[in-house]
Design a protein with these regions (language model features):
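Sec-dependent N-terminal signal peptides
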Residues: 4-12
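Periplasmic polypeptide-binding modules associated with outer-membrane biogenesis and secretion
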Residues: 20-299, 304, 318-336, 344-355, ...
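Sec/Tat signal peptide C-region and signal peptidase I cleavage site
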Residues: 15-19
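Repeated loop/turn-to-beta-strand initiation elements of outer-membrane beta-barrel proteins
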Residues: 254-256, 285-287, 298, 310-317, ...
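A short, conserved beta-to-alpha structural element at the edge of catalytic cores
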Residues: 633-658
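Transmembrane beta-barrel wall of Gram-negative outer-membrane proteins
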Residues: 346-440
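Conserved helix-loop functional segments at active or binding sites
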Residues: 148, 212, 229, 249, ...
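C-terminal outer-membrane beta-barrel translocator/porin domains of Gram-negative envelope proteins
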Residues: 273-274, 286-288, 292-299, 306, ...
Length: 709
């Protein structure tokens, strides 16, 4: 009778609260904040309660009346429940003595809510005992892998996850039916907790047979090649996950499930289990098309046709076509270099559209489950901003081998036949003099072949906006007549790059990148002149939105200046070039370091992010005496990122206090008809056009899509 009376009083109390809430005037929640929280961040606390602030766009009158904001009303009953929700959340995380107080500032139509939290001392894990695994696992090492650890707050989520860790470890040792019973005791007075796990491994089992279902055009043999398990193997839960991942990576299936079949034992034998692979095939063919805009591409478009299981045996065919420089390059020169594509004005390598047409054949599981063989045939015209234009056809063959879960080893061979055109003045730098006959030889079509070996390890948690993990790669390349290249194009090249990401707290990320590379050319003879020639497309360039952001694209390294006319100041004797253009030469070695702190914006934090960064870089030129450094350059800056489905749209502003790069100044000598005939060296160490001294004149703006690294 007493119990029914208590329930009745509680129900009537809730009804009275609900009635009061219904009679109260509507008030808009303008802000919700937390004070005193340290163990749990505000974002997690906010997700655990019902009361939330209206969007900032709703609080701006103009945007509010345009219907862009979202209004959230204050609910008195839910607000009181939020106090209980927060107390329960803290108990789950080991803070049994946490207290929550509230402060509400009310006006006629709005409320501002503050939750004041006194977390109190946590209950700490005093001991963790794991029983039943001594004959199978090392209990001490197992405890080190468990999320719950001694000396830390007793977190119920980590307590449950630790039981899953024990079960998974047993499953990977061949025990598919392992059970883990868990219990804990809490001493509130001593503020300690003891966790106890009792494992029952069950029988150890091997794979009896593998059944594939749901496949239609793709044969069971092709499915089997991607599996990490075989008949007779000891059962492993990780191997099942790995098999599922490998099948998805083939691009043949839209759904894959790999697990123990319902009739999990084979012929009633506990020591054998049946694995069922259930798949749902994806579309046989896909067509994708897209268009976009970039500051150094102007308008661009691309289309891809892919067909899976081409000619059977799991082979995939990808046909791709890409074009860029639309609107500025012939035959689509619509005069946009004078308006929205003004960055390309004066770039001689943007006068024709760039294109790529390619056909790629990909065969998975050729040399093993984690291997892929890829052949690509292509024709292209591509250019690097103010540096060069490449025209050619070619083919590449690459064999990739997965090493563990995160690493990939690739051996590739690339053979091309084409020409690379750079500014004539750049070739003059190569020869240390301007001989048209020798320059014409370098501009001719040449056969270029390179053998490359690369190793990549990727543990980043996102390919678009990583917040943890790293991406490290090393690539070695060799080109010489030994592998099919012409003698003119002979070099050894090594490049290493690493990016690391750490999350300081929710939304705050530190990103670091280091990159280094060196290329050593062989000796060739051109018109009886000894030269160490490296094709412009193989050289190192720095400066731009993904490099040292205080410099324009490719403008940090050695430069060549070319003017239509060079006047001489009668008073100072200084050269005054007319219609000056700048051409990057490229370098033989590079060293880059980028440090960036990424943080949420105080307004519209779900879409806007801020960044503060420091970029540093140095390039080395090759001389007879060896590599000569150009000097370390360091440029700090800040940035704004706007989140989009394709990745963040990025605007960076960097400060550059360095004078312009010094380099040779050439004047174009023309014939009587006005056609360019040759170049004349005017000054071997021209300091470049003067840079403004005002603060804003030393700012370099960079606009791009996607993080810098």
């Amino acid at each position: 009778m007493r119990a029914w009376l208590v329930i009745a009083v509680a129900v009537l109390g809730v009804r009275d609260l609900a009635a009061q809430a219904g009679q109260a005037p509507e008030r808009t929640v303008t802000s919700v904040s937390f004070r005193g929280n340290h163990a749990i961040d505000a974002l997690t606390l906010g997700a655990a309660i019902a009361t939330s602030a209206s969007s900032w766009t709703y609080r701006v009158p103009l945007l509010k009346h345009l219907g862009l904001g979202q209004r959230r009303l204050f609910d008195e009953l839910e607000f009181r429940r939020d106090v209980v929700r927060l107390q329960i959340l803290y108990r789950l995380h080991g803070f049994f003595e946490a207290r929550v107080d509230t402060s509400v500032a009310r006006t006629a139509g709005t409320v501002d809510v503050v939750f004041r939290i006194d977390e109190g001392p946590p209950v700490l894990v005093d001991s963790i005992v794991v029983r039943g695994v001594d004959s199978v696992l090392d209990a001490r090492r197992l405890r080190g892998r468990m999320p719950l650890s001694e000396g830390k707050p007793f977190d119920r989520v980590e307590f449950d996850a630790s039981a899953d860790t024990v079960a998974t470890a047993l499953g990977n040792r061949g025990y598919p039916f392992a059970s883990v019973f868990r219990n804990y005791t809490v001493d509130r007075a001593a503020r300690t907790a003891a966790a106890d796990y009792e494992a029952v491994p069950g029988p150890r089992a091997r794979i009896g047979d593998i059944v594939v279902g749901g496949n239609q055009a793709v044969s069971a043999k092709i499915v089997g090649r991607s599996l990490a398990v075989r008949d007779g193997d000891w059962f492993s839960q990780d191997a099942l996950y790995d098999s599922q991942r490998s099948l998805y990576q083939t691009d043949l299936f839209r759904y894959v499930s790999v697990g123990i079949a319902e009739d999990s034992t084979v012929a009633g034998a506990d020591s054998l289990v049946r694995i069922r692979v259930q798949v749902n095939e994806g579309p046989r063919s896909r067509v994708r098309a897209g268009a976009g805009y970039g500051t150094i591409d102007c308008f661009r478009a691309q289309t891809t046709f892919s067909t899976a299981n081409f000619l059977g045996n799991g082979l995939r065919l990808d046909l791709a076509g890409k074009v860029s420089k639309l609107g500025v390059g012939s035959p689509t020169d619509w005069g946009l270099s004078n308006s929205i594509c003004s960055a390309l004005s004066g770039d001689p390598f943007s006068e024709r559209i760039n294109y790529l047409a390619s056909a790629t054949f990909t065969q998975p599981a050729v040399f093993g489950r984690r291997s892929t063989l890829t052949q690509t045939d292509f024709a292209e015209r591509r250019s690097e901003y103010k540096a060069f234009e490449r025209n050619g056809v070619g083919s590449s063959l690459a064999a990739s081998f997965g090493l563990g879960r995160f690493s990939l080893l690739t051996l590739s061979y690339r053979l091309t036949y084409g020409s690379t055109t750079a500014d004539t003045a750049v070739y003059c730098v190569y020869f240390d003099r301007c001989e048209q006959q020798a320059i014409d030889v370098l501009k001719e079509r040449h056969r270029q072949a390179a053998l490359s070996l690369s190793l990549t390890r990727n543990t980043a948690n996102s390919p678009i906006e990583p917040t943890a993990g790293s991406v490290v790669s090393v690539e070695l390349s060799h080109a010489s007549p030994l592998v099919g290249s012409e003698r003119l194009i002979s070099y050894n090249k090594a490049v290493a790059e690493g990016s690391w990401y750490w999350q300081l707290e929710r939304g705050w990320v530190v990103a670091l990148r280091l990159r280094g590379g060196v290329i050593r050319p062989g000796v060739a003879f051109v018109v009886d002149t000894s030269i160490r020639f490296v094709p412009p497309e193989e050289r190192f360039y720095a400066g731009g939105p993904a490099s040292v952001r205080g410099f324009g694209r490719n403008e940090m390294g050695p430069l060549v200046y070319v003017a239509d006319t060079v006047l001489v100041d009668s008073a100072t004797g200084a050269n005054e070039p007319v219609n000056l253009r700048i051409s990057p030469v490229g370098s033989y070695a590079i060293g880059l370091a980028n440090f960036e702190l990424r943080m949420p914006s105080p307004v519209w934090g779900s879409r806007l992010r801020l960044a503060a960064f420091v970029d540093a870089g140095e390039l080395w030129d090759q001389t007879a005496a060896g590599l000569i450094p150009s000097g370390l350059k360091v440029t700090p800056g800040v940035g704004l990122r706007v989140g989009t489905p394709l990745g963040p749209v990025r605007l960076d502003v960097a400060y550059n206090d360095y004078p312009r790069q010094r380099g040779p100044l050439y004047e174009v000598i023309r014939t009587s008809s006005g056609a360019p005939q040759e170049l004349r060296l005017v000054q071997s160490d021209y300091p470049g056009p003067p840079r403004g001294t005002a603060f804003f004149q030393r700012l370099q703006f960079q606009f791009s899509v996607g993080e810098a690294y």
